[in-house]
């Protein structure tokens, strides 16, 4: 659980009246504001603060969402037939632009293999 603290007594004078977030599960503190040797947002073990006394402060801490992997969606509003015709007749579609990995790209600038890959990934029978 994370709680806010203000250090009220410490052997290190730079810690007096400093503000921290205390993570009691990890036994760590994150500096919010302190004089001297500790930087804002620095995380240290509670033991590095030495002998301290503190008072708790009300703090609202929003849970952080850690996304690893995840999903990515490119929306191309086209018919399959249009893309297949662009593969066979590139001169008819010089301005045809699609989304690939978040970027806008001219369909005709892709290799034939990439064009097929786009068509296969864009048009599926089911999700």
Curated annotation (Swiss-Prot):
- In which domain of life is the source organism classified? Bacteria
Per its UniProt record, what HAMAP family does this chain match? Answer: GrcA
Query: What Pfam families does this protein's entry cite?
Result: Gly_radical
Q: Describe the location of the Glycine radical domain by residue ranges.
A: 5-127
Gene Ontology cellular-component terms for this entry are: cytosol
Glycine radical PTM sites in chain numbering: 102
Provide the alphabetized UniProt keywords: Organic radical
Question: InterPro entries, from UniProt?
Answer: Auton_GlycylRad_Cofactor, Form_AcTrfase_GR_CS, Gly_radical, Glycyl_radical_cofactor_GrcA
Entry protein name: Autonomous glycyl radical cofactor
- Give this protein's Gene Ontology molecular function annotations: formate C-acetyltransferase activity
């Amino acid at each position: 659980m994370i709680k806010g603290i203000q250090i009220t007594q410490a052997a290190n004078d730079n810690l007096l009246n400093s503000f921290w977030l205390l993570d009691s599960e990890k036994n760590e503190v994150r500096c919010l504001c302190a004089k001297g040797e500790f930087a804002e947002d620095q995380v240290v073990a509670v033991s590095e603060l030495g002998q301290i006394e503190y008072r708790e402060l009300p703090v609202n801490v929003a849970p952080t969402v850690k996304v690893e992997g995840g999903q990515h969606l490119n929306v191309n509003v086209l018919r399959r037939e249009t893309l297949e015709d662009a593969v066979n007749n590139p001169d008819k579609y010089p301005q045809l632009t699609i989304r690939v990995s978040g970027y806008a790209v001219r369909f005709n600038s892709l290799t034939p293999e990439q064009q097929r890959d786009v068509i296969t990934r864009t048009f599926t029978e089911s999700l």
